[in-house]
């Protein structure tokens, strides 16, 4: 939009000669940068000095506010900024002005809001993200005395200012990364901050790790210098945080390489600290992340001549996760040709993917048009379409509701939406189904009066106005969901897109089942759900209450073909994101030693396993015949719960359902130290509230099982509060409650 202004006009009575509409256009088209210039911890409060970098001449018409937004919940607070002269503004914040009480895992993003001073001016406020230009910003951290948690300022990978709430933080920031013909040189600052442990850093080492069948680990010492310069401008209490400027040099000739294949190293930092008693404490960081998306980190390549062939060294970062790495390979003509062809092939595959994507878009558009046409046809009254996990299973809450309605409401016509590759169980049981995404399915879905689904439907499906959509969901939330997720690492999407699409699909839900009040609160916020929440307990758990008897257990054991005279341990570990050697090459082993378990417990127990399919397909149970049984592909995990005397799991949410049986549980967590950061992405304190003991070794597991086997064993003290919080609504009548709410009697 162009704007023409008569420069001969003059201001009258101190007022601008521009109209409000002209001013609006000018401010919307003016670049305004809001920059945090300084940050100081003033005895518990954070003092912020903010500079507004703009040529806009109408800023005097606006009042500026600092806005804080908690990333997970969306809760906001704001307060006015005080002008200290020119375009600089000052303010002070503490825990009391945060939009909600301080809790572990919170992240607050900072914005500057420009609001018209005059109430009669009809203009939306202008919101700008606050960027940061403060060196070593973490030094201004504060420990909240009420919660004993760190309130930690930091700069995001996009250069913006935020604070996060943590118990501890391993700080690693990079200033410069260079490569020469001799070495890789890295400078920056690092440290360790904690609200609990007063560790003093003794040494830091840079670790280069290569995975695969022949793992390599190399250590390089880091030169440290205490970071004290300018500290007086950041802290009024004189406290010197455990932060150090560092420099590390990695001689290229000391990095192992192979003439046959490329070696790829990930970078870690090893901390060696002293505790209060002078004892050495050692721990590693997670894989090092560059933390600056503006830095493309290109051109960091060095080629060295050796006796055999030239060797190429490259420092790189992964595009999405920003993790740093070093690639090393020979640079012979043969290798260069190989990578040249590989690059050409990669570009060809990329073009094919683009063409396929365009074709799929066209197909989706056609399907959507047909669906909308079909939805205008008369509704088929009392027709219900059920779907579980994208049509791949006959399971979960939809199954429980279907079986209840089949017995108690035969007047309804009920069909299952089934992926044709997973239709065998439906054929065996004689359950009516329609192949998912077929033409018949499209018309059936469009004309059905009810949908009963436990996961998201494709986003392109428009819900007809005559259809009632019951979303059952599929579990009590343990890990963060949807809008509560800080980052999303999934192929084909990003955090913003994932959240937007999730909320768009969730807006179609008319009813949502919640197993307890804890879940209701999370679902409402994370899904931004504002329609009817049915707080009923989970229908799928009716089976665990109504059929918990010796006859049912005996029948299931016969069906599973397992011994009836032995106790059963269900081992259901989760899949780890890092459970691989390289892309497409996974680790197919178990942390729990089955040899040792059989030797100590084989006379009294058997083990049934519910594993990730990649492990299940490649793990050989031959040596454990008669002791360990693989039921990873068994369709109904409820039946595995029912026959099990004991559950062993780790961070899987299966324990919420198993708790309904009031049977013992063990949590086998050998990697709890490295997994702890992920645990802090959970909704509750897993280590404190887990309804059973945490064990780290097979020996500890065996000892715990022997204690459970004793006649005087009682469930741990933590089980009662856990059951009261998560299972109090489960009574065997959840299906009935849901059906009576959604399928109202006519």
From Swiss-Prot:
Recorded GO CC terms: plasma membrane
Reaction catalysed by this enzyme: 4-O-[(2R)-glycerylphospho]-N-acetyl-beta-D-mannosaminyl-(1->4)-N-acetyl-alpha-D-glucosaminyl di-trans,octa-cis-undecaprenyl diphosphate + n CDP-glycerol = 4-O-{[(2R)-1-glycerylphospho](n)-(2R)-1-glycerylphospho}-N-acetyl-beta-D-mannosaminyl-(1->4)-N-acetyl-alpha-D-glucosaminyl undecaprenyl diphosphate + n CMP + n H(+)
Induction trigger: Positively regulated by WalR. Mainly expressed during exponential growth and rapidly shut off as cells enter the stationary phase.
Binding site for CDP-glycerol: 473-477, 540, 573-574, 610-612, 652-653, 657
Membrane-topology descriptor: Peripheral membrane protein
Gene3D superfamilies linked: 3.40.50.11820, 3.40.50.12580
EC identifiers of the protein: 2.7.8.12
pH relationship of activity: Optimum pH is 8.
Main subcellular localisation: membrane
Role played: Responsible for the polymerization of the main chain of the major teichoic acid by sequential transfer of glycerol phosphate units from CDP-glycerol to the disaccharide linkage unit. Synthesizes polymers of approximately 35 glycerol phosphate units in length.
Pathway info: Cell wall biogenesis; poly(glycerol phosphate) teichoic acid biosynthesis
Compartments where located: Cell membrane
GO molecular function: CDP-glycerol glycerophosphotransferase activity
Keyword set, alphabetical order: Cell membrane, Cell wall biogenesis/degradation, Membrane, Teichoic acid biosynthesis, Transferase
GO terms for biological process, alphabetical: cell wall organization; teichoic acid biosynthetic process
Pfam families in alphabetical order: Glyphos_transf
Species: Bacillus subtilis (strain 168)
Enzyme class label: transferase
UniProt record similarity statement: Belongs to the CDP-glycerol glycerophosphotransferase family.
Protein name per Swiss-Prot or TrEMBL: Teichoic acid poly(glycerol phosphate) polymerase
């Amino acid at each position: 939009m162009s704007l023409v202004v008569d420069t001969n006009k003059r201001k009258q009575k101190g007022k601008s000669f521009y109209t409000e509409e002209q001013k609006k256009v000018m401010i919307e088209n003016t670049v305004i940068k809001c920059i945090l210039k300084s940050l100081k911890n003033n005895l518990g409060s954070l003092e912020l000095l903010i500079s507004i970098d703009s040529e806009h001449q109408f800023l005097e018409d606006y009042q500026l506010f600092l806005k804080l937004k908690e990333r997970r919940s969306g809760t906001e607070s704001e307060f006015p900024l005080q002008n200290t002269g020119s375009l600089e503004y000052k303010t002070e914040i503490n825990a009391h002005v945060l939009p909600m009480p301080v809790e572990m895992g919170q992240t607050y993003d900072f914005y500057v809001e420009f609001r018209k001073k005059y109430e009669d001016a009809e203009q939306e406020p202008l919101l700008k993200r606050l960027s940061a230009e403060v060196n070593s910003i973490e030094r201004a951290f504060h420990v909240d005395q009420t919660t004993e948690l760190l309130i930690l300022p930091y700069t995001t990978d996009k250069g913006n200012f935020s604070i996060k709430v943590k118990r501890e933080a391993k700080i690693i920031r990079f200033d410069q990364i260079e490569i020469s013909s001799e070495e890789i040189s890295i400078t920056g600052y690092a440290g360790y901050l904690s609200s609990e442990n007063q560790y003093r850093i003794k040494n830091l080492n840079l670790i280069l790790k290569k995975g695969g069948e022949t793992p390599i680990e190399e250590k390089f010492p880091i030169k440290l210098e205490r970071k004290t310069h300018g500290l007086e401008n950041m802290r009024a209490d004189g406290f010197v945080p455990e932060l150090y400027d560092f420099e590390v040099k990695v001689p290229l000739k000391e990095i192992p390489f192979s003439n046959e294949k490329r070696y790829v190293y990930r970078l870690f930092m090893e901390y060696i600290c002293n505790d209060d008693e002078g004892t050495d404490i050692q721990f590693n960081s997670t894989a090092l992340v560059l933390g600056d998306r503006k830095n493309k980190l290109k051109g960091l390549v060095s080629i060295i001549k050796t006796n055999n062939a030239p060797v190429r060294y490259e420092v790189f970062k992964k595009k999405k996760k920003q993790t740093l790495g070093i690639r090393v390979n020979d640079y012979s003509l043969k290798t260069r040709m190989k990578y040249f062809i590989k690059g050409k092939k990669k570009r060809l595959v990329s073009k094919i993917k683009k063409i396929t994507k365009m074709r799929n878009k066209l197909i989706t558009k056609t399907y959507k048009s047909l669906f909308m046409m079909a939805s205008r046809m008369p509704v088929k009254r009392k027709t219900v379409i059920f779907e579980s996990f994208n049509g791949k299973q006959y399971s979960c809450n939809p199954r429980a509701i279907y079986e209840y309605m089949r017995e108690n409401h035969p007047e309804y016509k009920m069909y299952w939406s089934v992926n044709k590759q997973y239709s065998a169980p439906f054929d065996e049981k004689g359950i009516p189904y329609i192949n998912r995404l077929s033409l018949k399915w499209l018309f059936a879905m469009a004309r059905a009066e009810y949908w009963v689904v436990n996961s998201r439907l494709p986003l392109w499906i428009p819900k007809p106005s005559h259809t009632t959509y019951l979303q059952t969901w599929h579990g009590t939330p343990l890990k963060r969901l949807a809008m509560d997720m800080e980052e999303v690492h999934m192929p084909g999407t990003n955090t913003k897109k994932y959240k937007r699409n999730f909320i768009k699909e969730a807006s179609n839900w008319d009813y949502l089942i919640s197993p307890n009040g804890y879940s209701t609160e999370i679902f409402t916020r994370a899904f931004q759900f504002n329609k009817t929440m049915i707080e009923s307990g989970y229908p799928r758990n009716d089976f665990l209450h109504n059929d918990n008897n010796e006859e049912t257990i005996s029948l299931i054991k016969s069906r599973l073909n397992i011994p009836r005279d032995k106790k059963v341990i269900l081992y259901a570990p989760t899949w780890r994101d890092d459970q691989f050697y390289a892309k497409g090459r996974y680790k197919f082993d178990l942390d729990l030693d089955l040899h040792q378990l059989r030797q100590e417990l084989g006379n009294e127990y058997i083990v049934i396993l519910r594993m990730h399919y990649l492990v299940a397909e490649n793990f050989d149970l031959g040596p454990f015949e008669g002791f360990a049984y693989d039921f990873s592909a068994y369709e109904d995990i409820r039946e595995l719960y029912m026959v099990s005397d004991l559950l062993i799991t780790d961070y899987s949410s299966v324990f919420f359902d198993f708790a309904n049986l009031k049977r013992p549980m063990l949590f086998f967590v050998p990697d709890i130290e490295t997994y702890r950061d992920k645990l802090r992405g959970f909704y509750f304190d897993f280590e404190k509230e887990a309804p059973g003991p945490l064990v780290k070794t097979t020996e500890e597991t065996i000892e715990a099982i022997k204690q459970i086997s004793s006649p005087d064993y009682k469930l741990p003290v933590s089980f009662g509060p856990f059951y009261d919080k998560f299972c109090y609504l489960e009574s065997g009548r959840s299906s009935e409650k849901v059906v009576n709410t959604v399928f109202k009697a006519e």
